Amino acid sequence: MGTVKELAAAIRPLDKQKIQAASRHVDGLIKPTNSLGRLESLAIQLSGMWGLDRLDNLQKEIIVMCADHGVFDEGVAVTPKVVTWLQAVNMQKGLTGVCVLARNSQTSVLPVDIGIDGEPIDNMLSLKLSRGSGNIAQGPAMSRQDAEHLLLASASLVKQRALEGISVFGVGELGIANTTPASAIISVLTDSDPHDVVGIGANLPQDRVQHKENIVRQAIRINQPDARDAVDVLAKVGGYDLVGMTGVILGAGACGLPVVLDGFLSYAAAIAACQIAPEVKSYCIPSHFSAEKGARRALEHLGLAPFIHLDMRLGEGSGAALAMSIVSAACAMYCEMGQLAQSGIELPVPA
């Protein structure tokens, strides 16, 4: 994984033979064909990932990228910037929404300081290059060199955690004002008008959404990101957390392991990751349909259909934490259900 190009090249297609064998296995379970719907297709998808030798006893972890954004200074958020640092402390203590939901699904949470504008947090893993990204309304979020460095560092973190036993990754984020750069990324990479993408984020009043949209337009106009080059887009109108999430997605794919997406921020990262390495889409598992305005446009571009519709927009990886239970259910179905051939039951073949 010495370069982003090498990282992308390490992502292999799913194993077609394993998928065919898994499909036969699922069709032979004690149930009518396709009666467990998308649980069946999820189990088959997981079976085709070369990094998973088996689907039982999977160890799950959500990596949460925490960072601040210079564009906060443009008045695009109502929550104080210090809340990023405060919530990162709470996350490190296991008190935030993602931590509670992850515990419920037997999933660990790994917060990472990838650019918080604050003092180091005790015992928190750090990949930080600086305290917050640049203000995208005035110039680039970071240099291309820094973006590539953090993509590779985040992917290397995934590889390390995989070697330590993690077999299912989730991705999350924490950063006040980060829906602004996410909206810019989605607007550029999906060729969408910002009006169709920019939403309220963390409860921005409706009368300020137009200003936020104007800031996204300004960021795109000033930085002129190249829509054919996702790394350029991340560096110019993204942020450290978004780059880190993209690296986690690419890293999981390079390890042949699944990565469960979260909401709006993760859609932006996934769109970037899929442009860098189209094969990585096969390793992405959608979780929930974010309530953020641009969610539908982003998901349509990705061609992914979320499992969960709960009007959530917390972020942090909270949707990924919920979806981990669905991943576990698909694996339990695959590994623990009996086979029709041994049951004495004969079912009609569907027309």
Q: What are the language-model segments listed below?
A:
Residues M1-A351:
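N-terminal loops that bind phosphate or other acidic moieties
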